[in-house]
Swiss-Prot record:
Subunit structure: Homotretramer.
EC number, UniProt record: 1.1.1.424
Originating species: Haloarcula marismortui (strain ATCC 43049 / DSM 3752 / JCM 8966 / VKM B-1809)
Induction behaviour: Expression is induced during growth on D-xylose.
Pfam families referenced in this protein's UniProt entry, alphabetically: GFO_IDH_MocA, GFO_IDH_MocA_C3
Catalytic activity: D-xylofuranose + NADP(+) = D-xylono-1,4-lactone + NADPH + H(+)
Keywords: NAD, NADP, Oxidoreductase
Name of the protein this chain belongs to: D-xylose 1-dehydrogenase [NADP(+)]
GO molecular function, one term: oxidoreductase activity
Amino acid sequence: MNVDALTGGFDRRDWQEQTATDNPVRFAMIGVGWWTTEQAMPAVDAGDLCETTVLVSSDREKAADVAADSETVEHAITYEEFHDGAASDAYDAVYIVTPNALHLPYVETAAELDKAILCEKPMEATIERAERMVEVCDEHDATLMIAYRMHTEPAVRRAKDLIDEGYIGEPLFVHGNMTEPILELVPDPDQWRLDGELSGGCAVMDIGIYPLNTSRFLLDADPVAVRGTVASVQEEFADVPDEHGAFQLDFPGHVYAVCTASQNAHLDSHISVLGTEGKVRVEPAFYPWDDRALQLSHEGTTVEIDFEQIDQMEEEFEYFAHCLLTDTEPYADGEHGLVDINTIKSVYEASETESTVRLD
């Protein structure tokens, strides 16, 4: 197996046509928690196609303090002021990073204000609210993208290229896992991820979505049926159904994905696709702070291709800004996100009914 042939010609940003602009996309950050301040804003600052100009928070003083440390932020406003249209001339797009069940009202306001929308995954806490997000964006012709980092992660994109080029033959099985000790990472028993009304679920909803969605991306297909089992064992997870979860996805053509997720387990992430002639595996896969290794097995030989750590959030923001600047439809639009919400809710249904759930 020729490693140079596998790595040669690969463009980390094969989606990019425009590399600079005099008019960067201006973002309003909806929610000013640690993810915004430590991940999103630094990623935007590092990019070439966008900038942060507005911060929106329930706490004006907190937003103002963060704004004071930024060279580009012009306004720090409250959620109420955002809904009233304050500072709407100062931004072109919004990034929504509130708890899942609070996404919809910010999408509605942004769409009504003729703003583009980058919304964290999962797109909402219920199917009905997610469907309304798509409807309101269609009504106002607003661009909506769901924030799946794996779609612009170079190691995952190269794995997809190899699958598409036939290096593993016909895909047969996908195995994916994402697990973490959430109460060690975020030591707050009252955090919103453990509140079923705010989160819409726990392990499967928050991190099981990674192997689910990445399976869809790598296979370029959507599941047609699902089986699943979820359980909450520890007292801290009493308000959510899935401290742990495992589910099987049936794809067209007798291709199957087995995915596992836990919010109370060893930190781990990986995804692999096994085909009739070989296998690709990315490990670590999903956490943004890791270097990546892409392993390829074919005709009795296994090689490993190392990918240096990149800022996944920078790639995501640059991709979205590039779509807006070039008038290109984002890959992960609202309809794409709806497939995940329907599938996740079907995992819960399958677990409760101990049955296979067919997907529309």
